[in-house]
Amino acid sequence: CDSRQFFKEMTIGTAVPESKELAAAIHYFIQNRSVFDSYNVGEFERDALEKLEVLFKENPIQIMVGGSGLYVDAVLNGLDYFPEVDPKIREALLLKIEKEGIEVLQKQLKELDLETYKLIAIDNPHRIMRALEVCIGSGIPYSTFKNKPKKQRNFNNIKIGLNADREIIYNRINQRVDAMIDNGLIEEAKTLYAHKELNALQTVGYRELFSFFDGNFTKEFAISEIKKNSRRFAKRQLTWFKRDKNTLWFDYLTDKLTIASEVSEKINKLKE
């Protein structure tokens, strides 16, 4: 459940599972789309629920893995209702970001809706503009619309999270970025550079390299920015997932059998 691993042109930058990992278990929604396709969280919710309906007939236990919190929430709890917004608001925000930069919009969102500011990927201009246009158009914080009753699904879920000390997470991120560069991320980004305005490419790892290609960053600075923004994104991911008090958290070094045992216990309780 990774909102960027859908796209087949973004293999290296999204750390798509290796072929042996994909062969170990059947995967869905991995590189099944093109960056040129229009695909949003609502469409994913629909497609995932349709796929689950089929898969549950084969096995009552299915596993969803990934770090895109909004997409996970869409499948488990349904999407929130948001009011229609005057397109002129989006046009004004686009003009502002072009003239003054994303930092101005980040500051505005922080003032209008601190809760959303703390949770979303604030380096993603589309996410920032979406939250702001709702705040401005409705006169109500974007987060208010997200605090509605959850939709009822015809399945139960058990949520599991793996965590580690911040220093370990950040070191892993730095190593992962270095590995991506060694594996050809710069070359992959070059093949997508002509289409850098696409929503799918407003992504850490590509956005910084596009600035390098534009001549705004040196190669070394672009790589350091990828690391910094990846660390920032990881911090926000943890903030997002830790909102849910029902998640079972384990240290990343916890023995697999221990995790399996606790999960099995939870499953058995659901059967009672």
Residue ranges and their predicted role:
Residues 1-272:
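Phosphate/pyrophosphate-binding catalytic cores of soluble transferases and nucleic-acid-acting enzymes
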